[in-house]
């Protein structure tokens, strides 16, 4: 069934997206391969946070430069994503260690009861790494959207300074922010429908302190923060880099 769905996906991407659609298809499976590599390296005992950072960098390179080419738009987006990744990593690390997130929920214990719990691995690092991997896609998407829009503004406007270009980037970011926030929110809530049915008789305090719910709620809030931070950072980086490149090309 997965093969059939993959073929349908490929045909739709080929029909609608043409060459870009084919690149998107193979980039998707390349990203999936990176996730598999991430899991394999964790299973042999490597630090989950370091692996996650490497995977995030490789995913950013894959999504930006393979799909969109190596140009001033993608360079601006790449720099912006790396800055946000470092900022979010610091925030996630502090919260993860202080909140002591990680481990298994009561529902998971039943399915893994036959296995040994002595895996000798820091589950807090696993969750921190998972947060980084989960947020990177949204940040990349927002960043390249803003950078591409700013590049279009610059190419179609004869006279514009860095402040005006920055403002245009911020306006684009504000336009897509609400959509991004809603997408992230409903993606989380949809996974918790079964959870809410399971605990429909529980108090609000019990649910808000439940391990699985808290971990995913933290992930959601961090994703919100990353989606917001990427807007001014991309707008600023792109306003400087794109305008600088434009001035150099005109002078030559």
Regions found by a protein language model. Give the residues of each.
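Helix-loop junctions and hydrophobic alpha-helical segments within the transmembrane domains
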Residues: 162-177
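Membrane-interfacial helix-loop-helix connectors in multipass membrane proteins
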Residues: 42, 99-120, 197-217
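Pore-lining and gate-forming transmembrane alpha-helices of multi-pass membrane transport proteins
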Residues: 80-81, 117, 121, 125, ...
């Amino acid at each position: 069934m997965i093969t059939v769905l993959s073929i349908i996906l490929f045909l739709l991407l080929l029909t609608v997206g043409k060459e870009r659609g084919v690149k998107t298809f193979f980039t998707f499976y390349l990203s999936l391969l990176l996730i598999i590599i991430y899991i394999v390296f964790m299973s042999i005992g490597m630090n989950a946070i370091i692996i996650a950072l490497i995977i995030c960098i490789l995913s950013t390179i894959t999504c930006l430069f393979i799909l969109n080419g190596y140009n001033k738009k993608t360079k601006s987006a790449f720099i912006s994503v790396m800055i946000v990744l470092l900022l979010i990593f610091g925030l996630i690390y502090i919260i993860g260690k202080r909140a002591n997130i990680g481990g298994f929920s009561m529902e998971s214990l039943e399915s893994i009861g036959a296995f040994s719990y002595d895996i000798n691995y820091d589950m807090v690092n696993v969750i921190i790494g998972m947060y980084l991997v989960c947020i990177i896609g949204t940040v990349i998407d927002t960043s390249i959207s803003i950078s591409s829009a700013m590049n279009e503004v610059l190419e179609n406007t004869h006279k514009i300074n860095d402040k005006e270009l920055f403002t245009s980037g911020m306006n684009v970011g504000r336009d897509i922010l609400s959509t991004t926030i809603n997408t992230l929110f409903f993606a989380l809530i949809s996974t918790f429908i079964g959870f809410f049915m399971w605990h429909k008789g529980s108090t609000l305090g019990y649910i808000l302190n439940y391990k699985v719910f808290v971990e995913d709620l933290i992930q959601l809030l961090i994703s919100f923060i990353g989606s917001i931070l990427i807007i001014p950072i991309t707008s600023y980086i792109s306003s400087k880099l794109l305008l600088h490149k434009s001035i150099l090309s005109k002078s030559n």
